[in-house]
Amino acid sequence: MRKILFLLLLVFSTGIYSKSFTETDKKEVLKQFSELQNALKKKNSNALSTYVSYPLKDGNIKTVIWKNSSDFIKDFKDPENYVFSHLDELRVNSVSGQIDNVEEKLLERGGEGGDKFMEITGKFITSSDDEAEFYYGASGISKNDDLFVVTVSVYDDMFDGSSYYIFILSGNKLKLVSYLQLP
């Protein structure tokens, strides 16, 4: 009887906790991320708003950034509130599943803090990854969901800061679930 209960528990828990991205899911994420990038390039706030999970919270202080798509569209048009800087520069290929990270792109030469550089990375994160606690803690997302995280880092000799865009695939739709900015 104990063996049967153990096996049932094992089968049940595997079903609950095994929601990892398949290769097909990863390609779908990259396809939709590419569509998001096209909407960014065209400054199509209506299309962009469909990729945001509302209410979107700031991962730093857990305050709501946008309650709904109207808030998003209003902020998108205001350059002071623009949070998608450089997100469209990450190169993704949804057919091959390839992500080409941007490494040490020179943004400004000889500024106050020296040369200013940017790096952009995209990666898939599962709850078993070493850095998973940071992303799951910041986003408040269940560890049952795999994440697609895009990081935009800008740095020079005196300052560095990063923005983290945390996405999930929900109902086969890519959704930005948290935005986190560190100095």
Task: Locate the predicted segments by residue.
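C-terminal-biased regions
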Residues: 23-34, 52-183
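Boundary at the C-terminal end of the N-terminal hydrophobic targeting segment
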Residues: 16-22
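Short helix-adjacent coil turns
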Residues: 35-47
